[in-house]
């Protein structure tokens, strides 16, 4: 372990969060005792910081804050529980168990995330232990779904080449398992494992992370060209599968992406990962491990908003990182192999894999699986899960793929889809099919404006403009978040809105259609009327003046609405 890393937990400048981690005894803290407390629905701040590593955030229902305050009641505290599934793949049995948990202990809905995870909202403190135990009984886990560790490893879920996809998915699982925290705290606190005195030194207890873990979260994704649905350039560490004739040759390695920033602070910015070389499949785990350890040793532990891997690389330079990585590996990366991305969206409807199995991708608006009066989505999926013999795959765009349907089972699945009116989005605009929003209000404590609850309404209005312009079937990527943390990867969208205040958004234009370019601020702090007034002339002009095959994000740059952003370092210029 490097000298830098040893200093990071003690004498070097560090934030209060670093002290909490260092004193936590490998993520134990006082969580076990806190969960027994029935006086309050909340937990102390130190334990709340540690709870993230265990897969949960404390939240409250912000819609009820004022009313509860008037009644002199504490906020309506609740917990969001995030469930990891590498590559987003789960069995029908696991889907049914998640459905049961959501119905019994959460708010009755399942939220599919932009990192191919499940989120359960509205879990109260005294049900937390049972929820996490039941998640583990389903052979899933919440460990490291949040916190300063490697998060859920993403992987392209919709195969063009089934054999290649399966191989890539296996590597996603291996990376995830390899980078899991080794502490037994999770098993002791949630799964009633008996605590024993651990005489191992810190290197043995957490060989990759050490006692203070990483400076901030770390995200890994694997893309399978021509699809960039995982938004590989948004990842701290991305692997781009290189394959030909159904055979996986290896991966190009991309480093230093990230979406989060802080309003009003130009020292923070989104960034795209840079492709630095090629590795064989057998070298992937070592590259992932060494990259994480470099961030562990050199990431900023004093200022958390400057602690992501993108800043470590930008501060020191990409050549420094390549040299440091190759020194630790003891070998050099190979030259980057050619690759090509065509889009970062999902392929809806039925797709036949090269193994003759079928895959059906449902459009799920903003990832919220629930039953409504006129659309029983959750019930329909439950019926499918009862008879399905393949798998379910959560997509990076918050949709759901019913995977590996045999030709024999396909008619039965189709019948349920039709009976419940489950949609692949074919009747919606292409803009809506390429839309994403984060959860935001009322549960996210960071939200400055609406996102999930508002974007569908805004899209209704934008679709009227699309109809005027004849663009209803034009693929345009649009995203909305309630704050600048970037959960829906808004900085890569052709059109994006980032919440600034209630009903007000910063509007960005010019992201790359395939997720390869950042967008640029176009208008600041505007509401719905201004948004529509700004978009109408641009969309109409695009309809009339676009070149053949020209995407909207490319057009707004060519037409001079915004400048092209080649690097996050230029994002605020």
Curated annotation (Swiss-Prot):
One GO term describing the cellular component: sulfite reductase complex (NADPH)
Sequence positions that bind [4Fe-4S] cluster: 438, 444, 483, 487
Gene Ontology molecular functions: 4 iron, 4 sulfur cluster binding; heme binding; metal ion binding; NADP binding; sulfite reductase (ferredoxin) activity; sulfite reductase (NADPH) activity
Keyword Heme: yes
Biological classification of the source: Bacteria, Bacillati, Bacillota, Bacilli, Bacillales
Organism of origin: Brevibacillus brevis (strain 47 / JCM 6285 / NBRC 100599)
Family note: Belongs to the nitrite and sulfite reductase 4Fe-4S domain family.
Required cofactor names: siroheme; [4Fe-4S] cluster
Protein name according to UniProt: Sulfite reductase [NADPH] hemoprotein beta-component
């Amino acid at each position: 372990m490097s000298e830098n890393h040893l200093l990071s937990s003690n004498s070097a400048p560090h934030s209060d969060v670093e002290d909490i981690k260092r004193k936590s005894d490998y993520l134990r803290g006082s969580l076990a005792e806190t969960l027994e407390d029935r006086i309050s629905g909340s937990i102390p701040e130190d334990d709340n910081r540690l709870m993230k590593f265990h897969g949960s955030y404390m939240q409250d229902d912000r819609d009820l804050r004022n009313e509860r305050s008037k009644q002199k009641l504490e906020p309506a505290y609740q917990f969001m529980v995030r469930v990891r599934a590498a590559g987003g793949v789960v069995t029908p049995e696991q889907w049914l168990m998640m459905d049961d948990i959501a119905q019994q202990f959460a708010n009755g809905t399942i939220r599919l995330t932009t990192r191919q995870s499940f989120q359960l909202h509205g879990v109260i403190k005294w049900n937390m232990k049972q929820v996490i135990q039941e998640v583990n009984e389903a052979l899933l886990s919440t460990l490291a779904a949040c916190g300063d560790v490697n998060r859920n490893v993403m992987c392209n879920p919709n195969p063009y080449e089934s054999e290649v996809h399966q191989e890539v998915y296996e590597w996603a699982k291996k990376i995830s398992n390899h980078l899991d925290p080794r502490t037994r705290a999770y098993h002791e606190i949630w799964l009633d494992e008996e605590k024993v005195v651990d005489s191992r030194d810190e290197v043995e207890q957490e060989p990759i992370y050490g006692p203070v873990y990483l400076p901030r979260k770390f995200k890994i994704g694997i893309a399978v060209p021509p699809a960039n649905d995982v938004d590989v350039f948004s990842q701290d560490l991305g692997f781009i599968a290189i394959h030909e004739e159904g055979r996986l040759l290896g991966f190009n390695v991309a480093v230093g992406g990230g979406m989060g920033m802080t309003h009003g602070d130009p020292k923070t910015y989104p960034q795209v990962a840079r492709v630095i070389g090629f590795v064989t499949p057998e070298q992937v785990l070592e590259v992932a491990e060494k990259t994480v350890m470099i961030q562990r040793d050199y990431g900023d532990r004093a200022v958390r908003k400057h602690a992501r891997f993108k800043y470590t690389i930008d501060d020191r330079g990409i050549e420094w990182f390549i040299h440091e990585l190759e020194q630790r590996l003891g070998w050099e990366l190979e030259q980057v192999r050619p690759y090509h991305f065509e889009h970062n969206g999902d392929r809806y409807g039925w797709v036949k894999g090269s193994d003759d199995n079928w895959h059906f991708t449902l459009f799920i608006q903003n990832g919220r699986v629930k039953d409504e009066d006129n659309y029983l989505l959750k019930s329909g999926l439950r019926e499918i899960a009862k008879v399905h013999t393949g798998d379910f795959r959560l997509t990076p765009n918050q949709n759901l793929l019913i995977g590996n349907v045999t030709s024999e089972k396909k008619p039965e699945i189709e019948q349920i889809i039709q009976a419940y009116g489950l949609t692949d989005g074919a009747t919606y605009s292409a803009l809506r099919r390429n839309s994403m929003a984060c959860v935001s209000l009322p549960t996210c404590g960071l939200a400055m404006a609406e996102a999930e609850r508002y974007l569908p309404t805004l899209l209704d209005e934008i679709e009227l403009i699309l109809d005027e312009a004849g663009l209803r079937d034009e693929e345009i990527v649009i995203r909305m978040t309630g704050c600048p943390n970037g959960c829906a990867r808004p900085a890569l969208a052709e059109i994006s809105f980032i919440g600034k205040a209630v009903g007000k958004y910063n509007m960005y234009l010019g992201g790359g259609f395939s997720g390869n370019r950042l967008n640029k601020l176009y208008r600041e702090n505007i509401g719905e009327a201004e948004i529509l007034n700004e978009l109408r002339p641009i969309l109409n002009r695009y309809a009339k003046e676009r070149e053949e095959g020209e995407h909207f994000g490319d057009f707004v740059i060519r037409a001079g609405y915004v400048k092209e952003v080649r690097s996050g370092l230029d994002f605020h210029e």
